[in-house]
Structure formats: C-alpha cells, structure tokens
Amino acid sequence: MRYALTHALDRQTIVDSVVKDGSTAAFASVPNELAYNHGKDFTPNQTEFADYCAFDKNKALDYYNKAKAELGKDSFSFEMIVDDTEIQQNVAAVIKEELESTLPGMTISLRVEPKKQRVQDMQDGAFTLGLTRWGPDYADPMTYLGMWVTNNSNNYGLWSNAEYDALIEECTTGDLCTDLDGRWAAMKKAEGIVMKEAVIFPLYQQANADMIKSNVTGIEFHPVALNRVYKNTVKK
C-alpha cells in the first residue's frame, strides 16, 4: 500500500502549481547540497531512488491492486493530519486529489491542526497519514537518517529495521566514526533501506524566494540552521 500511495503522488505538479517558489520535487530522504565528502554531494541528484517513489500511475495501480488482494478490501479511507498554514493545506488538498483520482476506492480526509498539536499527535501515533517537514540542524546526512532509528521520537511511523539501526549505530558511535569513506557508504546504504521500504514519501526540497534591493549586499544564505545571516549586510 505504501508503494501505491507514493507512486500516485505527482510531485512536479505540487511544486509547479502549489508551492511555486523554486522548490524542487524530491525522490530521496536527504536533500541536495547538504553534505559533501571529497567534494562530492551525498545527494548529487534526485534520481537514485526515483524508482521507489516517482509518480507512475501504472505502478501505483499495480501495487494498489496487490494491496487490495492482500487485505481483502476494495476501498480504503485514510485521514491525513496537516498544519493549519495556507501552504500546507494547499499541498494537502493536491495530495488528496492525486491519491483519490489515481487510486479508485481511495478516500482521503484532512484533519487540520496547529503545528504543535500535529507534531504531538504524530509523536503519539495518533494518525494514519501526516504531512510534515524537516529542516537540517547540521550539514550531515545523519540529521535526516537519524530520525528513523527504532524508538526515535521523530520516527512517527514507528518503523523498525535491525539492519538500519545497526548501520546508524556504526556511523554514530561505532568504528565508522573515524572512517569517513566507510561512514559515507554506510549512510547511503541506510538511506536505500528507508527508500526501498517506503518509510516516508518525499515530496519536495524547499526553496526560499527573496527579493533583495540592488543597494543591499552581504546577506548570507545557508542550507542549515539559520537560513539567512545578516551580520555582514550593508545598505549602500
């Protein structure tokens, strides 16, 4: 069923018709231009795991039919919780439309909540589908990959995989802590597990559109922590 849902999502339509700020469709759990090893981007493009989640109506229907046969049902109803901001509600509305139009018998209802309540409900497991986001705290893939370790508070779906846990442990407290190349390879393997099991459905990599006056210089933009730093800003 997870494969059916993720393959039914047309991410390009979401970024082109709803978000419209330069954000790009995402098909990986770690964004582009976050972390580098020997000058190589951990996620040089968004194609590596696209086979597991990119929009494909035929794949979506095939997996959906398999799910219906396995579960012995012809129709499904899922509730998705979403923040009460305009952009999140607009994105959720398109997700609902895409899932219902691609998967016959699928009904998606939306539960709109303040972000604090939505996060709490997801941490409590009081949801079926949830629309959430994550901003990196530091420039390393682990700021994302660490979320899906068993019992992590951000592992909203309560997913658990022993191989994944072992890989992350080796990268954070094990021998790979001092082996940069080995750690890099292990994190990529861990990401592959997450994507192959459809633990999450990546939607888009957020961008920020800013208009800066021609007489203002020195604003710094960063992909982690504070996105904008103004300490060297000068107005001429």
Where are these regions (language model features)?
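Alpha-helical secondary-structure segments
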Residues: 1-28, 76-86, 178-196
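Sec/Tat-exported extracytoplasmic proteins
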Residues: 8-13, 18-22, 34, 64-71, ...
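Solvent-exposed loop/turn segments at secondary-structure junctions
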Residues: 11-14, 21-25, 33-37, 84-88, ...
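Extracytoplasmic/peripheral linker and loop segments enriched in polar/acidic and small residues
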Residues: 15-18, 51-54, 105-118, 146-213, ...
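Structural transition elements
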Residues: 25-66, 87-89
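Ligand/substrate-recognition segments at binding pockets and active sites
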Residues: 61-136, 208
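Long beta-strand-rich cores associated with HINT superfamily self-processing modules
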Residues: 210-236
